[in-house]
Each structure stands twice: as structure tokens, then as C-alpha cells.
């Protein structure tokens, strides 16, 4: 496969940045509203669970954002690039630290991406490279937030509905919207990865639809099975999560991940990967991806079947009579369809064998990544000057589009 051929920052990138920021604000507002509803109704336990999920998600996302800011500051070309593009916060470490401590780093990244994108797309100013660089980081942060907050919250929403045996139409709409949003965020992340590929391999509507469907059909039954089992054995589900999350984090460690530039950052990444794997597959290492994916899906399918069988055996036959049999049939069926759509995607739509562009031949082979300038990656786009390469996302691309 050819090397990367980046497009210039376009109005589509700007629209996605605006939608991402609006989604973040709406999601934050809905979380606050839901927490207030729990508190008003006297559901103190669920109130604190929801607040805890919000706090944990915010802490994880802000920590990733701060780590990346620190890593980027060590790159030789960072200050020159940010000053030339008049980037918000730029190289101001103290201000950036204060913003992240106040849990506003992710929001500032959204504002910076919109501001930079508007200057580049509408005013035709310089800085297209850094605008694209920012969108790549945001796509990864949104994915992390999705599985640290949105997926657990969706599980909680379904659990509350099952536990109370009360369901309103607005709850079904909210659950459907949340599930769709989670699958869409995975597609958005995939779209960001695809931007590194040659133009002929850009993600089309057909590819996006298949990718969306297999994620939707695998994530939805997983979340439903977790909520169903929690509705009858809530205490055991906490132990279930801790055991699987720990095992998944150790599996990520055994695979030798190298996404972050520090030991602490890498362990945070592995812990986050463990949380993502609790809900959905996420490739973290190139080579032999097919075998690792098969192991994961075999385990998750078995675990899901056990969860569903446990719920069936311990449920209240009277309270669940109207929907129990339908769920028992539908959830495994959706899961199986999701696996079929995933196989279809990898057979017909998935590019392979991409590798990040090589460093400048004049650089020493043993030079640490942190000492490689942003301009040391000679990526060309026609007659344009070399462009910035987001090493973090480029590494993810190499792993995701490796030969399976």
C-alpha cells in the first residue's frame, strides 16, 4: 500500500469539530440533568454512581490530554508550529496545567480545534497542519470518553429501568440514542484513522455503514447483557468487572503496547484499553490481529452467554414475562449478526499493510521519538510543504491496518 497522502483541512473537518464540541456540551448537560433527577427522586446510590462515572471519565480524559501536551512540548518543532499558527494555549505550560486541573482541558481542545479550523478554512490562514493534528487527538479523546463514561452510563440507565420495572418512551429513545452515539464515536475514530491512508483508500459511505453496523450490533447486546445480569446480581457484577478489567489490562501489557511516551502514561493507556475491551474490541498491536480478535470475541461471546443465562435463571418470571423470551432470542441473534458484519467489513472494505512514513534518513536510528522534530516526517501532498504527523494516531493506523 502507498504511503499516507493527507488532504488539506476542509469544511468537513470543521463541521466535525463543531459537532464534536456540541456533542460534548450536550452530553455534559444531560449528565448533570440525569444526576439531578436521581438526587431529586432520592436515588442517592445511583446519583453517586453517576457522579463517580463522570468524575472518573473526566480525570482519565484530562490526564491523557495533559500527557499529550507534555509530550508535544518536547518535540523540537512544537513551539515554532504553535506560535506560527497562533494556537490557543500553545506552549504555555502553566496555563495549560491550570486548565487541566480545573477539568477544562478537553473543552479547551475543542475550542482550539474550532478556532484553528475556522482560521484555516474560512480565513485561509496558515496552520492547516496543526488543525489536522488537533482533530486526530480529539478523535482519540472522544473514543476514550465514550468507553469511560457513555458505555457505563448506558449500562446504568438500562439497569435502573430493569430494576424499577418502570419504562417510559423517553427512556427507550434515550437508550437508543446513546447506543447509536457510542457506535458513531467508534466510526468517527475510524474515520480519523482513515485520513492517514491514500486517497483511494478513504472511507466511503458503504464502508462507514458496515463499520457502524457491526459495532452497533456487538456493543448493544454486550451492554444489555451486562445490565440484565446486574438487575438480578448487582453485587456480583462489580466483581465481574474488576476481574475482567484487570485481566484485559494485563493482556494489553503482555502485548507490549507503546502508545504513550512515558511509563505512567502507558499504564494509564493499558488500563483504559482494559475498560474498552470490557465493551468492545480495540486493536493495540500490529501483526496476528485476526487471532487476537478471534480469542477476544470467543471469550466475550461465552461471557455474554453466561450473563444471559444467569439473568434467565434468577429473573422474576412475572415481572419479566412480557420481554424475557424476546431478549433471550434477540441478543444472541444481534451479536451473531454483528460478527457477520465485521467479517464482511474485513473481507471487502479493510485496507491493510499501511506503515507510517520513515524518518528522515539523516536521523540516527536510535534517536528517541521525543527528539524527532514535527518536520522530520517527509509527508508530501502534491506541491505542498511537508506536513505534521500525529505520531500517536499514525501508530494506531499501523496497528489497525496491519496485515492480519
Curated annotation (Swiss-Prot):
The keyword Transmembrane applies. Pfam families: XK-related. InterPro entries: XK-rel, XK-related_scramblase. It catalyses: a 1,2-diacyl-sn-glycero-3-phospho-L-serine(in) = a 1,2-diacyl-sn-glycero-3-phospho-L-serine(out). Keywords: Apoptosis, Cell membrane, Membrane, Transmembrane, Transmembrane helix. This is XK-related protein 8. It is found in: Cell membrane. It is a multi-pass membrane protein. The chain crosses the membrane at residues 14-34, 44-64, 169-189, 209-229, 232-252, 262-282, 293-313, 324-344. Disulfide bonds: none annotated. It comes from the Eukaryota. GO terms for cellular component: plasma membrane. Phospholipid scramblase that promotes phosphatidylserine exposure on apoptotic cell surface, possibly by mediating phospholipid scrambling. Phosphatidylserine is a specific marker only present at the surface of apoptotic cells and acts as a specific signal for engulfment. Belongs to the XK family. GO terms for biological process: apoptotic process involved in development; engulfment of apoptotic cell; phosphatidylserine exposure on apoptotic cell surface.
Amino acid at each position: 500500500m502507498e504511503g499516507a497522502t493527507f488532504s488539506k483541512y476542509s469544511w468537513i473537518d470543521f463541521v466535525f469539530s463543531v459537532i464534536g464540541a456540541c456533542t460534548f456540551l450536550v452530553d455534559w448537560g444531560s449528565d448533570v440533568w440525569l444526576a439531578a433527577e436521581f438526587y431529586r427522586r432520592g436515588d442517592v446510590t445511583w446519583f453517586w454512581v453517576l457522579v463517580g462515572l463522570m468524575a472518573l471519565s473526566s480525570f482519565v480524559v484530562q490526564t491523557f490530554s495533559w500527557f499529550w501536551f507534555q509530550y508535544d512540548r518536547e518535540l523540537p518543532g512544537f513551539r515554532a508550529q504553535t506560535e506560527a499558527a497562533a494556537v490557543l494555549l500553545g506552549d504555555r505550560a502553566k496555563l495549560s496545567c491550570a486548565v487541566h486541573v480545573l477539568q477544562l482541558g478537553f473543552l479547551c481542545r475543542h475550542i482550539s480545534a474550532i478556532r484553528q479550523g475556522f482560521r484555516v478554512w474560512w480565513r485561509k490562514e496558515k496552520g492547516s497542519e496543526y488543525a489536522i493534528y488537533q482533530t486526530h487527538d480529539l478523535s482519540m479523546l472522544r473514543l476514550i470518553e465514550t468507553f469511560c463514561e457513555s458505555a457505563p452510563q448506558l449500562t446504568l440507565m438500562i439497569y435502573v429501568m430493569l430494576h424499577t420495572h418502570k419504562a417510559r418512551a423517553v427512556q427507550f429513545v434515550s437508550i437508543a440514542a446513546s447506543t447509536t452515539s457510542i457506535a458513531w464515536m467508534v466510526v468517527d475514530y475510524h474515520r480519523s484513522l482513515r485520513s492517514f491512508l491514500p486517497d483511494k483508500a478513504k472511507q466511503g459511505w458503504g464502508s462507514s455503514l458496515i463499520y457502524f453496523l457491526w459495532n452497533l450490533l456487538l456493543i448493544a447486546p454486550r451492554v444489555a447483557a451486562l445490565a440484565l445480569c446486574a438487575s438480578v446480581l448487582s453485587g456480583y457484577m462489580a466483581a465481574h468487572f474488576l476481574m475482567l478489567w484487570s485481566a484485559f489490562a494485563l493482556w494489553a501489557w503482555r502485548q507490549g503496547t507503546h502508545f504513550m511516551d512515558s511509563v505512567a502514561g502507558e499504564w494509564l493507556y493499558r488500563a483504559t484499553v482494559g475498560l474498552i475491551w470490557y465493551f468492545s474490541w480495540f486493536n493495540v498491536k500490529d501483526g496476528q490481529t485476526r487471532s487476537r480478535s478471534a480469542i477476544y470475541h470467543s471469550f466475550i461471546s461465552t461471557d455474554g452467554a453466561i450473563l444471559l443465562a444467569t439473568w434467565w435463571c434468577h429473573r422474576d418470571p412475572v415481572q419479566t414475562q412480557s420481554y424475557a423470551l424476546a431478549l433471550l432470542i434477540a441478543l444472541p441473534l444481534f451479536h451473531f449478526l454483528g460478527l457477520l458484519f465485521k467479517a464482511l467489513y474485513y473481507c471487502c472494505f479493510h485496507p491493510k499493510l499501511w506503515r507510517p512514513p520513515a524518518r528522515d534518513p539523516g536521523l540516527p536510528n536510535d534517536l528517541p521519538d521525543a527528539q524527532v522534530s514535527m518536520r522530520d516526517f517527509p509527508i508530501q501532498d502534491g506541491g505542498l510543504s511537508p506536513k505534521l504527523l500525529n505520531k500517536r494516531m499514525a501508530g494506531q493506523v499501523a496497528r489497525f491496518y496491519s496485515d492480519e
